[in-house]
């Protein structure tokens, strides 16, 4: 496969850095982190943005962005948005689609499972570490992995394909389909769809052959 060119790197950075934080941060408690991104999505010209969204057809991007835009109609800290984030990603009740890869790929369906350890080992071997205090989540949280994807495209582009093929694409579509189905608020339904379509489009562009594991959930 070809070396990542500057355009592809910039597009990957955009996708990962735009979508990743939306999975990681509570719209109310972490507003200072995500408010700019949420406000940008709330004021978006959906049709124009869809034409420019990387790795996704304009029609598919428009459908997903319209859902996200609709979900922000009552504001970036609306009760519906905040409580849906907490239902999906925080708890205390069981999460309908847990955001960690090993929950799906480990036979015991646990966090910090075998695939998490494989990712951690890959990061260690390549001298990559998540800054302390940035996240308490396992490394295979979907948001953490999207942010890491953006960082790799910017700082270590030679590792992007391997990271995608061996660690992210192995489970991302499976999880994101479940999240899209579980979402009861249009913002997160659209987020799940747009993220899945973006990663699948990136996989196609990079011509990556992924060995999918058995899913236990």
Placement of each model-derived feature along the sequence:
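Charged, alpha-helix-forming regions
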Residues: 1-217
């Amino acid at each position: 496969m070809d070396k990542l060119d500057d355009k592809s790197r910039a597009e990957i950075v955009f996708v990962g850095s735009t979508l990743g934080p939306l999975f990681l941060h509570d719209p109310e408690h972490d507003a200072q982190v995500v408010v700019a991104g949420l406000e940008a999505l709330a004021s978006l010209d959906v049709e124009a943005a869809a034409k420019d969204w990387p790795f996704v057809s304009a029609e598919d991007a428009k459908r997903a962005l319209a859902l996200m835009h609709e979900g922000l109609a009552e504001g970036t800290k609306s009760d519906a948005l905040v409580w849906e984030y907490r239902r999906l990603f925080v708890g205390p009740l069981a999460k309908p689609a847990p955001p960690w890869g090993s929950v799906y790929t480990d036979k015991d369906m646990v966090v910090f499972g075998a695939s998490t350890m494989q990712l951690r080992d890959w990061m260690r071997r390549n001298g990559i570490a998540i800054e302390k205090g940035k996240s308490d989540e396992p490394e295979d949280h979907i948001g953490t992995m999207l942010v890491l994807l953006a960082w790799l495209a910017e700082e270590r582009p030679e590792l992007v394909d391997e990271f995608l093929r061996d660690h992210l694409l192995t489970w991302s579509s499976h999880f994101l389909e479940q999240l899209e189905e579980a979402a009861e608020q249009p913002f997160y339904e659209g987020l799940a769809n747009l993220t899945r379509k973006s990663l699948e489009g990136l996989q196609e562009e990079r011509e990556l052959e992924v060995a999918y594991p058995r899913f236990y959930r």
